[in-house]
Amino acid sequence: MERPTPRVTKDMLPECSGKTVRIVGKANQVEGETAKVDSNGSFDMHLTVDNTLEPNHFYEFVVSVKPDSSVQLLTCVDFGTDIDMEVYQKLVLFSHKYNSLFFE
């Protein structure tokens, strides 16, 4: 069975060192192998040559959080240009409050 990939926001990333997580965010800027992403706060994400992101699109990113809290993109799904991030924030909080429903 695969390990669960909990949903998080930017402010939760330091707690996720060494883990694979999901994070919904907006790709604000993409330059080379780095993207600036906003998900309840801005952070830089390392890309590979296989990753192409459209600026101003929302994505669900599956990322690896490194021990230094840097973020490496593993895969993503384009969610388009209109996501209610307030609802996503509530989903994240709900999923952590009732983690047995989502992670076990």
Swiss-Prot record:
UniProt keyword terms in alphabetical order: DNA replication, Nucleus
UniProt GO molecular function: damaged DNA binding
Keyword Transmembrane among record annotations: no
Annotated localization: Nucleus
Annotated Pfam families: Rep_fac-A_3
Function: As part of the replication protein A (RPA/RP-A), a single-stranded DNA-binding heterotrimeric complex, may play an essential role in DNA replication, recombination and repair. Binds and stabilizes single-stranded DNA intermediates, preventing complementary DNA reannealing and recruiting different proteins involved in DNA metabolism.
UniProt name for this protein: Replication factor A protein 3
